[in-house]
Regions:
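Domain-level signal for soluble alpha/beta catalytic cores
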Residues: 1-250
């Protein structure tokens, strides 16, 4: 993280996998159960996160707590399993004094999703809300913010976390227009308070080889679409150099 941060004046977010993801990638030749292994891994990760925070890292993003995926398994996970996933996540983040993001999506293998029709977060959401994180982000662009309605009955006085919604799709090369982004945000605002809403992408672009140019313009649309809604809400808009006419070639 320190090496990356030296390369830019902008804050660098540190990304790391969730401990509950690892059993599908590791051979367990030592522990009696995968859950015991996960909790030990979570404890080791926790030490690293505390060191990162102490070094000045402003944001740690933990990738893919597995609740939503394992709800789709056959047979599906139990409520007890979902409670364990939340407890393991909270062990990872215990006493970490920096901003924590939990990223969730429906997959990004080779710029693909694991599902043609995206499932719902409905069963996983109550357990996600109990995770010790400052921002919970979910995939929304791919399904036109269909799951935003799941936040309708959330008691916002009980939770202090923010909700990040993806407004550009990592699995499509077609760049969303700013108007499409704005429409996704408006749908989310029907259920999520504006001071709790964070605008992001469904997933990352770089790891799986999406064209840098396409990724760039998706990010431009993300900001320009957000500006449309900011203007509607009377909130200051962000400057977008790409849209500044003084830099145009024609």
């Amino acid at each position: 993280w320190k090496t990356a941060q030296k390369m830019t004046r902008k804050p660098v977010k540190f990304g790391n996998i969730c401990a509950t993801c690892l059993p599908m990638m590791l051979w367990n030749d030592h522990y009696k159960t995968d859950q015991a292994m996960v909790m030990d891994i979570a404890a080791v990760m926790n030490e690293e996160y505390i060191a990162l925070a102490d070094a000045g890292c402003p944001v740690i993003q933990i990738e893919e707590p597995v609740h939503h995926f394992n709800c789709q398994m056959e047979p599906p996970c139990t409520d007890k399993d979902l409670e364990f996933y939340t407890n393991a996540f909270n062990r990872q983040t215990k006493d970490v004094k920096t901003e924590i993001w939990a990223h969730t999506c429906w997959g990004n293998p080779n710029q693909q999703s694991f599902y043609w029709e995206r499932p719902s977060y409905e069963r996983a959401l109550p357990y996600f809300m109990e995770m010790n994180c400052d921002v919970l982000d979910i995939e929304c662009a791919s399904n036109q913010a269909r799951d935003a309605k799941l936040f309708k009955n959330i008691d916002w006085n009980k939770y202090d976390k923010k909700i990040g919604i993806g407004v550009v799709d990592h699995t499509r090369t077609t760049v969303e227009t700013p108007e499409m982004v704005a429409d996704t945000i408006r749908r989310a605002l029907e259920y999520i308070p504006e001071d709790r809403l964070v605008i992001t992408a469904d997933c990352g672009f770089g790891r799986e080889g999406l064209s840098r140019r396409i990724a760039f313009y998706k990010c431009v649309s993300l900001v320009m679409g957000t500006n449309i809604v900011r203007k509607e809400l009377g909130v200051e808009e962000a400057y977008v150099a790409t849209a500044d006419e003084q830099f145009a070639f024609v």
